Amino acid sequence: YMLYESTGESIDLKLEVEHLRNYIDLMLLKYKSDELPEVDFQADGTLEGCLVAPLILLPFVENAFKHGINNNGEGFIKIRLDTSSEELKFYVNNSRFQDRNASGEHKGIGLENVRRRLKHLYSDNHNLEIISSDNEYSIDLRIGL
């Protein structure tokens, strides 16, 4: 997917969602069956024919696994994607554990890159809201279609 299908300026949302599901399945392989984290991904609306920038949603799911699930499989991730003819809504909510990166290196780089990419690709036709507390982290992304 990353090498061949996502090389253009846009990709069918159905393929992007399929890639997200594959990524989630891959991440869950590292946990034993008795310590699987709670991961809930629901996609509603019409996915086929809806074009988005490739890999624009993946960094949020990557961050949810990185910061929302500890090594024992404790934590949760809730992902919702909904499309209408006018808008894509993408919501990720996850538990939050203390920063694993004690040195502070690379902190927030991925998120800053996504912000820049959204600004470049969607200008003022998107909104990204981030809500962070001690125990939970949420992003609410809306992109005009």
Regions found by a protein language model. Give the residues of each.
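Two-component histidine phosphotransfer core
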Residues: 1-131, 136-140
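C-terminal coupling/interaction segments
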Residues: 143-145
